[in-house]
Amino acid sequence: MSRICELTGKGRQIGHNVSHANNKTKRTFLPNLQNVTLLSDALGKSVKLRVSTHGLRSVEHNGGLDNWLMKTGDDQLSANARKLKKEVAKKLAEKAA
């Protein structure tokens, strides 16, 4: 299972451990990923995702999964999130018509 957020696309970063003597050794910084089930109001079902805590806070701040997907540009979304956004947009268009 890859260590990438399914909503934001946030992944691992590479850096250094730095000792007191300023010796540098390579290390990786991993995102804090959580397995969550988010409810989509438009689709009327729950969606299981592996999301970073930063992504989860963003979703809650914007008032839910559907609102967050609609407000976020496609260039900032991962492939799974773009697919989910397309489904939500289609359902919202059907409800509006």
Swiss-Prot record:
Keyword Ribosomal protein: yes
One annotated GO molecular function: structural constituent of ribosome
An example Gene Ontology CC term for this record: cytosolic large ribosomal subunit
Disulfide bonds: none
InterPro entries in the cross-refs: Ribosomal_bL28 (IPR026569), Ribosomal_bL28/bL31-like_sf (IPR034704), Ribosomal_bL28_bact-type (IPR001383), Ribosomal_bL28_sf (IPR037147)
Record's keyword terms, sorted: Ribonucleoprotein, Ribosomal protein
Record family assignment: Belongs to the bacterial ribosomal protein bL28 family.
HAMAP family per record: Ribosomal_bL28
Protein's recorded name: Large ribosomal subunit protein bL28
Species of the source: Sphingopyxis alaskensis (strain DSM 13593 / LMG 18877 / RB2256)
Gene: rpmB
